[in-house]
């Protein structure tokens, strides 16, 4: 765990680790020169399983997290941010999963949101498979860092484990890098409460995250799209990952072509029938979400339904009521 100006919340996070059903763990926390009393709070814990390291200089979250992971002695590394809450069975469930699946390098878990004391379901509910996660990771960051556990010996084949130049997208980058060394899976039951802060993230954080996540996708897309990798990554990040409405037919068509090309590269002849069905359902849901978002924002009219679309986007999956409501909202916004 990396800690910085976390005095108000880090205690609750630490307590969630101490309350785990699996008690054979070590918790390594690196304080990144916090200007508040975070270090004092950390040193107030006397449990011998907790190791507190005080960084001599402020290095930022990525380097600080790498220090913590390199100091850990266990065979598995579990990620955790200073304000998130582990549910009691998190470590036990993930250790059991990795013990039972030696081909998996990293296992994540579903997460629910914790906002102002209230718990609400996370966005990524539903069953997953390693193949479906691979598909999703080619479109957006599909995993929550604080839910991740990975094999230490595999993670340390990466140098560094997380790259500082990918700030705020370093976890997304890690998933693709470690995915070349072993499988990635997810336990679909929520094992974490991911804290949402009032007011959301800063514009600086958001712009840096988008820029670096786009870089990650561009690297991944290079063998698929060649010279078009950068632009295709930009479009996918803006409209698929960030959900910004598409405003013209040309962009819609290009995104459809990207999805079709990705499916051909990842799925055809490689995924079994069950995984192919899951991916095709995901494509259909994604396409109609893009359509609905564009219409509702007033950027496009319902006539875009006549556009060529990926063959996996089935009309049977289209919720016509949503389209009608979105069309009315979009009309008002265009007039306004």
Language-model features and meaning:
Residues 8-11, 36-44, 85, 89:
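Acidic helix N-cap motif at the loop->helix transition within catalytic regions
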Residues 15-24:
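Short, acidic, metal-binding catalytic loop of nucleotide-sugar glycosyltransferases
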Residues 16, 31-40, 57, 81:
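A conserved acidic beta->alpha catalytic loop
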Residues 55-72, 93:
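Glycine-rich, basic loop-to-helix element that forms the pyrophosphate-binding segment
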Residues 70, 109, 127-242:
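Conserved nucleotide-sugar donor-binding catalytic segment
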Residues 77:
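Short aromatic/hydrophobic "clamp" motif used to bind/position activated sugar donors
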Residues 89-122:
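Conserved donor NDP-sugar-binding/catalytic core segment of glycosyltransferases
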Residues 159, 196-336:
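C-terminal subregions of glycosyltransferases and related glycan-biosynthesis enzymes
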